[in-house]
Structures are given as structure tokens and as C-alpha cells.
A protein has these predicted regions:
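Sec-dependent N-terminal signal peptides of Gram-positive bacterial secreted proteins and lipoproteins
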Residues: 1-26
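Cleaved targeting-peptide boundary
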Residues: 24-34
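Glycine-rich loop/hinge motif
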Residues: 133
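A cross-family detector of function-defining hotspots
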Residues: 32, 44-72, 77-118, 125-127, ...
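Amphipathic, non-transmembrane alpha-helical stretches in extra-cytosolic proteins
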Residues: 36-43
Length: 192
């Protein structure tokens, strides 16, 4: 009887240890892949770097306007009224005078630009939404380059920008991809 108990206990311990190690291995492997992607990005001579985007004159036009479809998130485009956003997406999870929040998606309005609440920028901080071309928070930067090409600009916060801007001004219309060096951490669609 005692031998059966020991054998059963040992079998259970091995089973539990085997399951725990595979979880640890998966976590370790995921972290190792993230480190590898980040180091490859830093070492690659073709990888865009912020210092390559500092030679412009103030006011110089950089990039080009993106198609209207690219300037939408969750079916909402810039310039849409807050009332139309609520009619389309329902009640927001949070509502402020200058911002509607739906989970990880925020539709913002700059009160200085217009007294009516119109969407002037959209941010996405999780995988609740994707760009029109299918990029989401958590996707790697290689995928962004494969889909959008080289950034039109990299700002002083190291965000990749695609679209139209005038250097050293607030005249910006396009998409920013904030990242941690290997993966997208936030999307910003803006028309300033």
C-alpha cells in the first residue's frame, strides 16, 4: 500500500513539474524572441533610425497624405462628431468633455481647435482595434515596415510616422506608431 502511495505521489509530482516547466519554457522562449527581435532591429543597417530624419528645414513638407481609409479606426474617421461616434459604437466606457473612450480606443478633441466635439485624434493602447492595413498594438516593427514601408519620419520620441507633416510645426496628418524598440505599444491617428 505504501509503495502504491509513493508511486502515485511521484507520478503526480512529475506530472505537475512537467506542466510547470513547459509554462516557464514558453515564457522564457517568448522573452528570448523579444530580446532577439530588439537586438536584430538595433543592429540592422537597413532599420530606420531617428538621426536619419533630422536634416529637414523648418516648414519643409515630409511625406504625403494617407488615403482616407487609413485615417479610420473602428470605422470612425477624423472629423466625425462625438454624437456620430456614439451612434456608431454605442455608449463609451468613459466620457469626458474632450474625449470618448471605448476600452483601449480613445477619440479625442482639442477644445482650442473647435467648440464642437469633433474627433481630431484617435489613440489605440491595446488590441481592441487595428489600422485599416491590419497593424495592431503588439505587432512587431518588421510587420509595420512590411505593410507601410520605411517611416516618412521618426520624431524625437522615436515614434514612427506615416503621412503628411511640415517639419517643426503642428501641421501633421497621419499615423504614429509608438514602440518599445521591437513591438508597437500605441497607435495614434492625428490631424493637427
Amino acid at each position: 500500500m505504501r509503495i502504491k502511495f509513493l508511486a502515485l505521489s511521484l507520478g503526480l509530482a512529475i506530472l505537475l513539474a512537467g506542466n510547470m516547466s513547459s509554462v516557464a519554457d514558453a515564457s522564457w522562449l517568448s522573452k528570448a524572441m523579444d530580446r532577439l527581435e530588439t537586438s536584430n532591429a538595433k543592429l540592422s543597417p537597413s532599420w530606420p533610425k531617428a538621426e536619419q530624419y533630422r536634416h529637414y528645414r523648418p516648414g519643409q513638407v515630409i511625406g504625403a497624405y494617407l488615403p482616407a481609409e487609413d485615417m479610420k479606426i473602428a470605422g470612425v474617421s477624423l472629423g466625425t462628431s462625438f454624437d456620430a461616434v456614439k451612434a456608431s459604437l454605442g455608449q463609451p466606457t468613459s466620457e469626458k468633455r474632450d474625449e470618448l473612450t471605448y476600452g483601449g480606443i480613445k477619440f479625442g478633441h482639442s477644445l482650442m481647435q473647435d467648440s464642437r466635439p469633433i474627433v481630431w485624434y484617435i489613440t489605440v493602447s491595446n488590441r481592441d482595434a487595428v489600422t485599416a492595413r491590419g497593424i495592431a498594438v503588439g505587432d512587431n516593427l518588421k510587420k509595420v515596415m512590411d505593410v507601410y514601408g520605411r517611416p516618412d519620419f521618426i520624431d524625437f520620441n522615436n515614434r514612427w510616422f506615416y503621412g503628411y507633416l511640415r517639419y517643426n510645426s503642428d501641421n501633421i496628418r497621419g499615423i504614429f506608431f509608438e514602440h518599445n524598440g521591437s513591438k508597437v505599444t500605441k497607435l495614434i491617428v492625428s490631424d493637427n
